[in-house]
Amino acid sequence: LTLDMTLVPDFGQVRSDNNILNLGPFETKFNENRSFFTEGTDLFNKGNLFYSRRVGGTPLHYYDVYNQLGANETIISNPQAAKLVNATKISGRLQSGLGVGLFNAVSARTFALVEDDNKVQRKIETSPLTNYNILVLDQTLKNNSSVSLINTNVLRSGADYDANVTSVLFDFNDKKNTWNTGGYVG
């Protein structure tokens, strides 16, 4: 198994995304450019449940600040990304063919700073303290078959919503790899 950790990472050197105007109901998904989230992440991509760009991404209430401005207030600063405090991942495959992946990351509370005409400033929380977790167990079987269990979990401090998703994936092949059946439950 391999252990990777990062403490207060600075992804400032990472290539930025092109601006895209999305008028549809679904978010635009960008490729991951941060090396910590691209290296050794094959297990975490199973089932397509984990989108790493949300970790340390745009604060949950980034756009709500405009609706919370008082009379004669202007926005002084509104960070576009929640600051990542740490991230840890353990991944690898045991001799039994069991793939194990554990991921944990914490992003700090994020605040916008607003100021009124009298130079009185106040903070508006745009993202709570957030903990991201993923557990993946992937058992390889004979004939290139496999069964996987994936759990993703997001815990936020305060009144903001949490998320917990679990799924079981399966992929079965016959001896000659002629026939395949696969699917998921979750």
Regions flagged by a language model, labelled:
Residues 1-186:
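Outer-membrane beta-barrel channel domains
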